Design a protein with these regions (language model features):
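Small beta-barrel nucleic-acid-binding modules, primarily SNase/OB-fold domains
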Residues: 2-13, 18-173
Length: 173
């Protein structure tokens, strides 16, 4: 009985490892739409579409200052072009969080941060190089860093959500 349990645990462990390796394998695709600075739509080789949320970066929302500029930058880098991506996880909106590479191993999240169109998303990244890219873009006042009062997307969303929850009372009581 104990031996069967040990064998079963090993089998489950191997299945989990195998699935993890498959999840992290590289996928070839073509970018067919840009939703915002950090979200794109990829056309896979099997003709399926997949929405990809870029890993390790957070760009301004479209309605935020520099949001459209971030979207344009991302478009200029990958729209209509072949890419390779790695699935990392799923977010709460069921989008695939992905690391996207293009043009001889350029890492899209890093390029966005270097150009000053996104924040290093330190809450979900241990890649200190991205922090250095952000600091460099800040010093050079690139992209959104031209605005000394730039508000991070997570702060912008927090304020926006707070205002949406507080509805004014109108009419007679």
């Amino acid at each position: 009985m104990v031996i069967e349990g040990v064998v079963m645990r090993k089998i489950i462990y191997l299945v989990l490892i195998f699935n993890s390796v498959l999840f992290l394998s590289q996928i070839r695709a073509k970018i067919i739409a840009i939703k915002d600075g950090d979200t794109v739509v990829a056309l896979l080789e099997n003709k399926q579409q997949e929405t990809l949320r870029l890993a390790e970066v957070d760009c301004p929302e479209n309605s935020q200052p520099f949001g459209k500029s971030a979207k344009q930058f991302t478009s200029s880098q990958v729209f209509g072009r072949p890419i390779i991506f790695y699935r990392i996880n799923k977010d709460r909106y069921r989008r695939t969080i992905a690391k996207i590479f293009y043009e001889n191993e350029k890492y899209l999240s890093a390029e966005i941060i270097k150009a000053g169109f996104g924040w290093w998303y330190y809450k979900a990244s241990k890649n200190i190089q991205l922090k250095e890219y952000e600091n460099s873009a800040r010093k050079k006042k690139l992209g959104l860093w031209k605005d000394k009062n730039a508000i991070s997307p997570w702060e912008f969303r927090k304020v926006k959500n707070t205002h949406q929850k507080i509805k004014p009372i109108t009419g007679k009581r």
